[in-house]
């Protein structure tokens, strides 16, 4: 009721004539015009002009997986009307990284069950968050199965209590955080590199669409050449690609600068670019650290339970 009163006060009216404007999603215009045709009113529909774009409200429409990221996107800010919807790109990485950090079948099943029960209530205000928990629960179960973790080593500990002579020591696994730490670290940084390059690809395409071709070449394409050069050098193919990439960094960093600023721009681009990339990729090592920490904490928590039972049994 309060909202209706507020909307009424905002209408343009002189007591006899009422005029107002608003926005409607394009796919709903047919439904709107069908309703307005039944009313005693005149109306016009038009696409937003370039000047109006900053004022156009944003309605995100994604699939079930990407829609789950709405609760995170809305905490920061919605993209501009002519911008890029981050949800389809962010969702796979976010859900994948979450599952990688948790990596436990038991925790994942709890997340799946809790979110499923909540979604059965169909509360639209909280639905996005619970959908995110659901999909994160899926990847948590998957990574838990890959690492053989069910509430840590709870099952082997439980079986050991029931049958001290059992040979069951662990669930089958592809890798474990304690034994394959370096492999997980390399995998985490590789996934981080893929995410960063994906972001660069989106930036590259958007700059091309806006006609900022030189910016797209010097700020994104240049570093792709550098990365390709590093890969070629590591494989022992050739060093020429890397030299070309570094030359492009030097040329691109100073192409818009003037005078002595070209020199400082070159050194700044090389130093900030290389150290920045190294730091960004290295930061994904936290995925491995959190997976390892969760595994260790679970084992520490489960061990006293088994030890207490063993002492009681001996007594």
Give residue spans per PLM region.
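Active-site lining segments that contact anionic ligands and/or coordinate catalytic metals
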Residues: 17, 93-95, 285-287
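Core alpha-helical transmembrane segments of integral membrane proteins
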Residues: 67-166, 172-202
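Generic beta-strand/beta-sheet core signal
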Residues: 25, 46, 103, 112, ...
